[in-house]
Curated annotation (Swiss-Prot):
GO terms for molecular function: serine-type endopeptidase inhibitor activity. The lineage of its organism: Archaea, Methanobacteriati, Methanobacteriota, Stenosarchaea group, Methanomicrobia. GO terms for cellular component: extracellular space. SUPFAM superfamilies: Serpins. InterPro entries: Serpin_dom, Serpin_fam, Serpin_sf, Serpin_sf_1, Serpin_sf_2. This is Uncharacterized serpin-like protein MA_2613/MA_2612. Keywords: Protease inhibitor, Serine protease inhibitor.
């Protein structure tokens, strides 16, 4: 799995945003972040962000995939240099503590755990800041992003050599994502006003602890809605997995080799994913997950799926409460430079590939700135032939690294849809 985020800070002379109604979402008390820690803050933001992406999905009818951990990590680099009300708003939406020292120390501790890795999988993280040559970035900011965020800092000539700069950044992105994300910085996006580009990349490639047997994969029917069917490649395995259920949903844990990371799949009962996800909270997810037990084999069927998504996050973040950072008059990144900066655009692009042996995914964000248990003797079934929500999580820290929804699974040659004249 690979995740990439790109943040571009652009100095603009005009084009301020209009006044925007701010609707912050408070899943946890931001004042309590220091008590909850980085994982609780990250996971609360994950569910807030998911609720916003659902609103976009309702208009475009797509699957959902994003990396809350990467979005938060990239925004944290911005937060390091943010002051005033812009800082307060980022703190509220991302649940960052007001104390920068506490935050960056805690974040570094968490990152060190998440990326300590093992021989059973590959999980890497990389940050980079690309700065316009001779642009006055504060030395303290450069020191902090290098030491606490493990960020590279490279000078480029955006003004005189925009194409060469674009090529250098795109090559870095492709290298960090195993060539899954290409041309993340499109032609014409680097202008005379571009001053900084911040990139964050996460790469994950892991094999299942219990691999699915390819011989058991067969064509089965998946029901995206009560009136639609699609033929999919359904994988099957019967093994001793952690599992639980309540009146609303089932959950199963599919660990990766090394047992540091797992995929959790939440399967709502019935076929009404919209109603379920509109009421599904981080606390309910945590309770459902922590009620899991390993009581014997679970007959598990999940579809192979492979898809890409690309989402403009700027409007969603503004609606969530990060408004000032996108407004030239109100943005305050004085911790980065004395020259006024703003975030003008933020794009998140993702890729995921789930098959019998491995999971691989990539995500990219570009910001332009200027329990019911069964007995042991009874076989349990987890048949994901309806839309489901999935998480890829670090078990050591409980941080959600990736979150998404599969409503229309497709995998190279599959995905033939037809409507039903009846309700399932």
């Amino acid at each position: 799995m690979k995740t990439l985020l790109i943040f571009t800070l652009t100095l603009l002379c005009s084009g301020c945003l209009e006044d925007t109604a701010v609707t912050p979402i408070n899943t946890i008390n931001p004042d309590s972040v220091e008590y909850y820690g980085v994982a609780a803050a990250n996971n609360a933001f994950a569910f807030d962000m998911y609720s916003k992406l659902v609103q976009l999905e309702s208009r475009e009818k797509n699957n959902i995939l994003f990396s809350p951990y990467s979005v938060s990590a990239a925004m944290a680099i911005c937060y390091e240099g943010t002051e005033g009300t812009a800082k307060e708003q980022i703190s509220n939406v991302f649940y960052f503590p007001a104390n920068n020292t506490v935050f960056k120390v805690r974040l570094k501790e968490t990152n060190d755990k998440v990326y300590s890795g093992s021989d059973g999988y590959e999980l890497e993280n990389a940050n980079a800041i690309w700065v316009q040559e001779e642009y006055p970035v504060k030395e303290e900011y450069i020191f902090n992003v290098k030491n606490y965020y493990r960020s590279e800092v490279t000078n480029l000539d955006f003004v005189e050599k925009p194409d060469e700069s674009r090529d250098a950044i795109n090559e870095w992105v492709e290298d960090k994502t195993d060539r899954k994300i290409k041309d993340i910085v499109p032609k014409g996006s680097i202008t005379d006003d571009t001053r900084l580009i911040l990139t964050n990349a996460i790469y994950f490639n892991g094999k299942w602890e219990h691999e699915f047997d390819k011989k058991m994969t067969s064509k089965k029917t998946f029901y995206p809605t009560k009136r639609e069917e699609v033929s999919v490649d359904m994988m099957y395995i019967s093994s001793n997995f952690n599992y639980s259920e309540n009146l609303k949903a089932k959950i199963i844990e599919l660990p990766y080799k090394g047992n540091d990371l797992s995929m959790y799949i939440v399967l709502p009962k019935g076929n009404n994913i919209t109603e379920f996800e509109n009421n599904f909270t981080v606390n309910e997810y945590t309770e459902l997950k922590y009620n899991m037990e390993s009581l014997g084999d679970v007959e598990t069927s999940i579809p192979k799926f492979k898809f890409e998504t690309k989402t403009e996050l700027s409007d969603s973040l503004i609606e969530m409460g990060v408004a000032d950072a996108f407004d030239l008059k109100l943005a305050n990144f004085s911790g980065i430079s004395e020259i006024r900066l703003l975030i003008s655009r933020m794009i998140h692009q993702d890729f995921i590939d789930v098959q019998e042996e491995v999971t691989e995914a990539a995500a990219s964000t570009t910001v332009f700135i200027g329990s019911v248990s069964s007995s042991k003797s009874k076989s349990r079934e987890f048949k994901a032939d309806l839309p489901f929500i999935f998480f890829i999580e670090d078990r050591r820290t409980d941080c959600i690294l990736f979150m998404g929804k599969v409503e229309y699974p497709e995998y190279e040659g599959t995905g033939r849809f037809w409507s039903l004249p009846w309700n399932k």
